Regions:
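DPxDG-like acidic metal-binding loop motif
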Residues: 95-105
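ATP-binding N-lobe of GHMP and related small-molecule kinases
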Residues: 1-94
Length: 105
């Protein structure tokens, strides 16, 4: 098993710039990482699996970790290794601390 820390952040400033053709917006942001993190444990598996120690977090296709996995698999189709990820959630959900996007990154 390999573990990674996924740090929370606080935005010091955020400016929304122009809207892009994909309906997202370009932004300019200044943030600092804070001493609060989730832990992602990776293990080899026969197929992708996501588990979370918080029942309030969905583990379906709407989860940003699942979306990041699908994005990578499409672009790395020659890679045959599969893995499971277990998320130990410590960053508060919906607290504006960037936990979900940090987990996906």
């Amino acid at each position: 098993m390999t573990s990674f820390l996924s740090h929370a952040k606080i935005n010091l400033g955020l400016q929304v710039l122009n809207k892009r053709e994909d309906d997202y917006h370009n932004i300019q942001s200044c943030f600092v990482e804070i001493d609060l993190e989730d832990t992602l444990d990776f293990s080899q598996a026969s197929s992708f699996q996501l588990s979370v120690d918080d029942a309030d977090i969905p583990i379906d296709e709407s989860n940003l970790i699942s979306k990041a996995y699908r994005f990578i698999r499409i672009r790395a189709e020659k890679v045959q290794t599969e893995f499971s990820i277990h998320l130990k959630k410590r960053i508060p959900i919906g607290g504006g601390l960037g936990g979900g996007s940090s987990n996906a990154a």
